[in-house]
Amino acid sequence: MKLTCMMIIAVLFLTAWTFVMADDPRDEPEARDEMNPAASKLNERGCLEVDYFCGIPFANNGLCCSGNCVFVCTPQGK
């Protein structure tokens, strides 16, 4: 009986301690780029111009500025 009461008290104490010591997320930045704005610039990629190698061919792969890739970036059809 005493052991059960001590275990219950210990669990309640540790639970309360966790809530008291937890960080308040309202004071922190919301997005990763707000945490370290310089790092977000590393993720920005430029597109490849016409006649540059773009890899596996498929439309709108995001590598070519024109959006057309057939092993090399091709100009947009008009």
From Swiss-Prot:
GO cellular component, one term: host cell presynaptic membrane
Subcellular localization(s) per the UniProt record: Secreted
Chief place of localization: secreted
Signal peptide boundaries: 1-22
Entry-linked InterPro entries: Conotoxin, Conotoxin_omega-typ_CS
GO molecular function, one term: ion channel inhibitor activity
Xref: Pfam families: Conotoxin
Keyword Disulfide bond: yes
Keywords from the named record: Amidation, Calcium channel impairing toxin, Disulfide bond, Ion channel impairing toxin, Knottin, Neurotoxin, Presynaptic neurotoxin, Secreted, Signal, Toxin, Voltage-gated calcium channel impairing toxin
Keyword Disulfide bond among UniProt keywords: yes
Residue positions assigned to the propeptide: 23-45
Name of the protein in question: Omega-conotoxin PnVIA
Protein source organism: Conus pennaceus
